[in-house]
Amino acid sequence: MARSIWKGPFVDGYLIKKVQKLMESGKSEMIKTWSRRSTILPIFVGFTFSVHNGNKFVPVSVNEEMVGKKLGDFAPTRTFYGHGADKKVKRK
């Protein structure tokens, strides 16, 4: 079920403060965050976030196509190694 429109997008408050500080200073540092649940806003475009995937921090460079999605959508938590190979084929 989607979030109701009248509530607006959810973004952790500290994340907005960090982005605004970097905009004022003009620096382009990586913003380290554990907040996978935060929605990407238009002011985030051009910044690089280090999003935690449960094990390490994954760099996510935000562009215009990402606006409206969650930060966690771009930092996968599971690694797919492929389906199990057929053992009968290996014996030949």
From Swiss-Prot:
A GO molecular-function descriptor: structural constituent of ribosome
Keywords (A to Z) from UniProt: Ribonucleoprotein, Ribosomal protein, RNA-binding, rRNA-binding
GO CC annotations, alphabetized: cytoplasm; small ribosomal subunit
Signal peptide: none
PROSITE patterns: RIBOSOMAL_S19 (PS00323)
Superkingdom to which the source organism belongs: Bacteria
Function: Protein S19 forms a complex with S13 that binds strongly to the 16S ribosomal RNA.
Descriptive protein name: Small ribosomal subunit protein uS19
